[in-house]
Amino acid sequence: MPVINFTYDELFKQLGCTLDKKELIDILPMISSDVESYDETEVKAEFFPNRPDYYSIEGIVRALKGYLDIEVGMPEYKVVEGDTTLTVDEELKDIRPYVASCIIKGVEIDDDELKNIMEFQEHLHWVIGRDRKKVAIGIHDYDTVEGPFYYKAGTPDEDKFIALDCNEEESLNQILETHDKGEKYAKLISDYDKYPLIVDSNDNIMSMPPIINSDLTKLTTNTKNLFIDVTGTDLTAVTNALNIIAANLSENADSIECVKVVYPYHDDVTYPQFEPKVLDVHVDTASEYIGMDLTADKIIQTLEKTRFNAQKVDDNTVRVTVPRYRIDILHEV
């Protein structure tokens, strides 16, 4: 299971209050965590693969706020319509056909958060992305590029860029041969005549998914706005990953700006897709499965503490609104 590392100081800062350290260690299992280890400064906690919304400290804090009655009910995010587009190349249909994107405005990134973002990205690569085969994620400094954006098929020996943490411009094939990420993930695209690229309106290459980002868009502690791209072979997985990233990384940001993905072979899609799922929970069914005598009011109170919205329909029915980052919730049971 993924192990999430965080410091007490980092967590308490985002939580907005300080807990006794032992109290925190006792609470974490109540939000589905297995505490692997801890010391005076840091905690290492495991979370199940069906809860990728916990794979960054923002997701953990969001759950703790509910458990501690600091904030209950479904979180609300400021999502603003924008005119940014990401246009998909027809040639990618049989290579890596799907992409999702959004822009997160007004982030504050210190060294701890920079580390958190990188670890969050890699955890999602493993759990949702199946080690990047199904989904790959790019997180960029938005202020280094200019829209509109393009998801295009690049020519391996002609297109060139400076890969992340490198100094020299190389062709796409050279990056596959010389960069450690290129060597590790080349098998995912090397059989194709062209490779996927994310580029901006000035033809700056931002990334070669699922391999490596460009050094041009590297995140730093001066980064204020994020451009997110998620590419993959499965549209549902791509959408789920983008929604989770958008929700978590905007917890401490000003807003999320929508990006419209324009396809030549699929309906256009605007992201993020935060329209919640709505389902009914029945008191008698819940009581039978849990083995307790429950009431609609008690179920509502519990659901709100776990960051759902819930309202009473009748004495046996509670209507539940499920946020889109909770991809583990499939049905009533």
Residue ranges of model-derived segments:
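RNA/tRNA-interacting regions in translation and RNA-turnover enzymes
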Residues: M1-V333
